[in-house]
Amino acid sequence: MFICSLGAKIKVCGRHNVPKGGPFVVVINHFSYIDPPFVIHAVQRPISFLAASDQVITPLYLWAPFLYGFITTDRTRLAPSTIKKSIHALKSGDILGIFPEGTSLSRVLRPAKNGAAFLSAAGNTPMLPVGIVGLE
């Protein structure tokens, strides 16, 4: 699925690929702090995102808990507590959103980390790849 922002207009391509029910892992490229609302708009279901623990306390994230859930994670390693919370969310039927590049505010696509694939396999859930263009 692709999400394209053309000014204020949002175009979603491939929405038919979004699973109709059940849990899954949404794997998204990450260019901006405003990526999560675009993904929620495209998927049209609540999503809990993995968020870097050092970013959760910044003013840019103060609005996040009101719009969607998040599970904090360490940028450098996938901690056991993050794994447990993420798998619990998937087993409870939630959708888990992961930005596998591990950071935002980049103008180029960065190499992905393997946590999304690990959590998808551990939770026995499908992955939905999502590409965002137009925000870089």
Task: List PLM regions with ranges.
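Soluble catalytic domains of membrane acyltransferases
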Residues: 4-136
